Amino acid sequence: MFQTKLRNETWEDLPKMSCTTEIQAAFILSSFVTFFSGLIILLIFRLIWRSVKKWQIIKGTGIILELFTSGTIARSHVRSLHFQGQFRDHIEMLLSAQTFVGQVLVILVFVLSIGSLIIYFINSADPVGSCSSYEDKTIPIDLVFNAFFSFYFGLRFMAADDKIKFWLEMNSIVDIFTIPPTFISYYLKSNWLGLRFLRALRLLELPQILQILRAIKTSNSVKFSKLLSIILSTWFTAAGFIHLVENSGDPWLKGRNSQNISYFESIYLVMATTSTVGFGDVVAKTSLGRTFIMFFTLGSLILFANYIPEMVELFANKRKYTSSYEALKGKKFIVVCGNITVDSVTAFLRNFLRDKSGEINTEIVFLGETPPSLELETIFKCYLAYTTFISGSAMKWEDLRRVAVESAEACLIIANPLCSDSHAEDISNIMRVLSIKNYDSTTRIIIQILQSHNKVYLPKIPSWNWDTGDNIICFAELKLGFIAQGCLVPGLCTFLTSLFVEQNKKVMPKQTWKKHFLNSMKNKILTQRLSDDFAGMSFPEVARLCFLKMHLLLIAIEYKSLFTDGFCGLILNPPPQVRIRKNTLGFFIAETPKDVRRALFYCSVCHDDVFIPELITNCGCKSRSRQHITVPSVKRMKKCLKGISSRISGQDSPPRVSASTSSISNFTTRTLQHDVEQDSDQLDSSGMFHWCKPTSLDKVTLKRTGKSKYKFRNHIVACVFGDAHSAPMGLRNFVMPLRASNYTRKELKDIVFIGSLDYLQREWRFLWNFPQIYILPGCALYSGDLHAANIEQCSMCAVLSPPPQPSSNQTLVDTEAIMATLTIGSLQIDSSSDPSPSVSEETPGYTNGHNEKSNCRKVPILTELKNPSNIHFIEQLGGLEGSLQETNLHLSTAFSTGTVFSGSFLDSLLATAFYNYHVLELLQMLVTGGVSSQLEQHLDKDKVYGVADSCTSLLSGRNRCKLGLLSLHETILSDVNPRNTFGQLFCGSLDLFGILCVGLYRIIDEEELNPENKRFVITRPANEFKLLPSDLVFCAIPFSTACYKRNEEFSLQKSYEIVNKASQTTETHSDTNCPPTIDSVTETLYSPVYSYQPRTNSLSFPKQIAWNQSRTNSIISSQIPLGDNAKENERKTSDEVYDEDPFAYSEPL
């Protein structure tokens, strides 16, 4: 009927005819009939197949099964199945675009789909109610396209495993509702738009096509193409439906409410609906259209809220963070990469820009692998004048070129100390270094490393150069080194930390001791080139002059030997034999860089009579340009020093005594040879650490037998947390400072590790060459294990924080350390019945909590915290009433007393290493027992554990200062008179013994608030600072100086608080790592054997004091008897007068 009606029309006169309802129904019903009939057929077939399978299972081998398994039929069936399988595999390869033909096929289908959609756009310009005649050239083209779609649909149908699931797929529905109407149009010789708008859903395959064409490669481009395809396909499809129903009207009203709306207007309406903004100029009038708009609005809320902001972010990030940094000539900048997070960036900027915000002209370029978060963006905006963020990776040369790393002053690599896998973090940062060095070998690198054993890879990079400023900041090495120094010298951990912590928060304490502590926190380690007028003078002379005239505390210098193979490096408190040369770098403890510039400006001519430090400025006189210092100037300087000494001491200067440096050096060598005669083969090849043969783990593992207690005394207990799966923390870095060779073998304290045997077994291969180390399997949370280690008589208990766990709460990372501190702190020890010398009533305990009014004391504890904000838990256990109410760790009472440590401040060392890497080298030397970057360059790792080759190398390695804590009354400091102020003590100890005093450890004066007699640290007191009789003094003590006086044996037993005291050990064993017996044994007290002979030189001033024979004999008699030869040599030395030989000093290593 439809065909007859169409044939009666004249095509030339009526190219666009009106489509009747019957024609439109024919187009739509063809699609619905195809869809539902096919679905019903598939369902019926599946039901029949399942029934047959079920019947075969019930009946077993039936007639049908016999037919398939019989002879020729069975073989033909197998061949057909094989052919079908191969055919199906080929089709799947084509459809998955794994082959070139398959890729062409997929791309062709997408292109033809877009072509069919374009034809729909062209035909949509005609009214929906009209039908196109076959004279329209687009109809045959669209018919060809749909014929190809039919072929592709058949291939997909045959390759589908689940036919029903395939039939209900979106692409299948698109084909079913667009292909059949095309063939109906061929039969009716007319075409109608119908549901052809569904072809727009093929746009969802746009990301796949672009990936096949390799047009997109990055994740951002893939994400953007996916979002774009979703939005476009949704808009075009929804606009097509609105265009259809609005132009056709509601079917039950027979189109009476229809409106003439173009496809463009439909898209406009859909976009306005998607943005949830309706302008009202174009609206839906039909019920179907309005119902669709209601549901589409809900879907638009999800679409617009989720996808549009992400697209805007992609566009914004692309413009903001993917550009290149323009390196301007004359503009300095650094590149920072690695762990770019809110915490790391905040810590770095705070330290890099501290106190210099108006002076810094160095820009910071952050190279981050992920776009910054909103919080991080806010930080960058706050420091907009200094920071730039570039999105990229240090592993890619293209990104390194974008940040112009070859023009940067340095490249700083930040590590994440709280990561769960520290080894992986180190390896990734080392790979960044390798990438940067391969890109530009001259770029200066400063890298943070978490585990010390990963440091060895960096110097092996061919372009790594220590001399140009390449540096390594090892968290494990420094952190555990600080804790080890706190175990050796109570309070030293806080003393050293305060020199590198910058406090910007102003606190106004009321108590006097708090004011002293906070004022001392202003002192920092600063460097300055020394004035050429100091050339030719000894270090004690320069240190004394700087202290008295400039109020500067000089503690170390950078020494460069005149010989090619001589020692070059930093020396702490060098002996008088070391002479200051021109352009020597000095290390000071001072408050501001302005103060230390006085050491550069000092002129022996202009400042000869100047006694006010502020008046020592750059004089600019001609004498400063002289190449050599003249004798009159030296004499003038000596005369000035005499006057200052008399002014300070209030006494006439002692008579001048000259002695031969060569003879003193020989005597020192003889004395040391006697001291190390028994263990000269027990140091490593560098002479820096005590060494022993590898010891098996079983031999040092302490067995628990009943209620036994090992008779350790004056030992160090280290509480370790971890299991077999925990990352190693590098306990070797904790042991090395405790086994430094500048302590004699008798001074070494036993180390007892309490922890999991599975964990400590993994660490043991790095510890088995160190003597006197023991392992007690157990847990520090169990008091029974603590008692077994005889913790009551230990000199210090270090509670080490456990290795970080994956996805751990930052507040809970210190749970074990806090609970262990609580357990150990609750131990009450009866001091009246304790035979240990650690209970001294004459000298109150520095951290042992002993009180004269109480018979109980507490175990000295040093706790490590990973999260500094957890300090308030430790403050509650401190035993001090009215402590500093601060959440800042470095303003807490626990920190001021030296009972807590956190490595969080190590982040600031990046800025320190960039501005002045010499300060970092000094810190490494102080906390690691003498290891510096210069030593690491020359030491072969395989030889570190070897035996020292000779006594000469041994002595040169050992002959370095050690940090100690001395009493004003029970040590040789009692010979300093007067000693009422710190300035008098400094000059006297330096003159008499070469001991450099750097700080105080004072008892908190409020006794009612300090029942345990805790002490606090005072860093670099003022020259006029009044001393108290109970003060302990932080000192840099020469190796050849013994510090203890013992007129009677009982006095030594009263000196427990004096650090560097001889270790109280059990009876001597042939094996140094043999654990002490459980039974009680007779204990022997040892005292160090050193020379008391004063060091003198030709440029003598009040420090040169003649020691009479009776005093020498008195001092010598207080020590363990020397060998006959050593005694005779000592007596000879004390009576002789020598001339100076400046080259007799054996340079320290």
Swiss-Prot record:
Result of changing I413F: In SPGF79; severely decreased protein abundance in patient sperm
Motif Selectivity for potassium positions after renumbering to this chain: 276-279
Compositionally biased intervals (Basic and acidic residues): 1125-1135
Family per similarity comment: Belongs to the potassium channel family. Calcium-activated (TC 1.A.1.3) subfamily. KCa5.1/KCNU1 sub-subfamily.
Domain RCK N-terminal positions: 331-473, 713-884
Cytoplasmic side: 46-101, 160-163, 210-226, 313-1149
Catalytic activity field: K(+)(in) = K(+)(out)
SUPFAM superfamilies linked: Voltage-gated potassium channels (SSF81324)
Record organism: Homo sapiens
Gene that encodes the chain: KCNU1
Signal peptide: none
Keywords: Cell membrane, Cell projection, Cilium, Disease variant, Flagellum, Ion channel, Ion transport, Membrane, Potassium, Potassium channel, Potassium transport, Transmembrane, Transmembrane helix, Transport, Voltage-gated channel
Disease: Spermatogenic failure 79: An autosomal recessive, male infertility disorder characterized by asthenoteratozoospermia with acrosome hypoplasia, disruption of the mitochondrial sheath, and reduced progressive sperm motility. The disorder is due to an abnormal acrosome reaction and impaired membrane potential after capacitation.
Subunit note: Homotetramer; which constitutes the activated potassium channel. Interacts with LRRC52; this interaction changes channel gating properties, such as shifting gating to more negative potentials at a given pH.
Cellular localisation: Cell membrane; Cell projection, Cilium, Flagellum membrane
Main location: membrane
Intramembrane region ranges (chain numbering): 260-282
Any single GO BP term: potassium ion transmembrane transport
UniProt-recorded Gene Ontology molecular function terms: potassium channel activity
Protein's UniProt name: Potassium channel subfamily U member 1
Role noted for this protein: Testis-specific potassium channel activated by both intracellular pH and membrane voltage that mediates export of K(+). Represents the primary spermatozoan K(+) current. The channel underlies a pH-triggered membrane hyperpolarization during the process of sperm capacitation, as sperm encounter the alkaline environment near the ovum in the female reproductive tract, thereby playing an essential for male fertility.
Comment on protein domains: The S4 segment, which is characterized by a series of positively charged amino acids at every third position, is part of the voltage-sensor.
Extracellular compartment spans: 1-24, 123-138, 185-188, 248-259, 283-291
Pfam families reported in the protein's UniProt record: BK_channel_a (PF03493), Ion_trans (PF00520), Slo-like_RCK (PF22614), Slowpoke_C (PF21014)
Keyword Transmembrane found: yes
TM ranges: 25-45, 102-122, 139-159, 164-184, 189-209, 227-247, 292-312
